[in-house]
Regions:
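S-adenosylmethionine
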Residues: 1-148
Length: 148
């Protein structure tokens, strides 16, 4: 059971009216979808999808964003992060919501980008991919221990 802190619950109840609030709590209880982002600098989304499906993974692509793929079937613990495809940088494990900022920015090869909240790096690597490893992309974070 998800436990919301009382202050947070009060705040959310002001935003989400009472008839809808139980639905919000129900949604919070659902497991998050396992989503990966294809690194198009190394492989096309079609080739990655085919490669992962050969391993028995059930993949669906996110409408309007072919680089984003949902892993539909249950995998072994750690399988998503330990696969050879992940280890060689063919995909990055990344929430769909995290992919939205770089998509909104639409950085190109000619741009200079300063990412001041870069750790752990999912949005930064996505921007590098979108910029085709060109332009200038500086990654920094206020918390030095988050940078690796």
């Amino acid at each position: 059971m998800l436990e919301l802190k009382p202050r947070f619950e009060e705040y959310i109840k002001k935003i989400i009216p009472e008839p809808e609030f139980p639905k919000f709590l129900e949604y919070c209880e659902k497991p998050t979808r396992r989503i990966i982002r294809c690194n198009t600098l190394k492989i096309s989304p079609e080739k990655l999808k085919a490669r992962l499906e050969k391993k028995g993974w059930e993949i669906s692509q996110v409408k309007g964003f072919p680089e984003a793929m949902v892993i539909e079937n249950k995998l072994l613990p750690g399988e998503l992060g330990k696969s050879i495809e992940h280890q060689t940088g063919l995909y990055y494990v990344q929430e769909l919501s995290s992919m939205m900022s770089p998509l909104a920015l639409q950085a190109t090869k000619e741009d200079y980008v300063l990412d001041l909240c870069a750790a752990p790096g999912s949005k930064t690597t996505q921007m590098a991919m979108m910029m085709e490893n060109s332009g200038l992309l500086i990654a920094n974070d206020v918390k030095i221990d988050r940078l690796r």
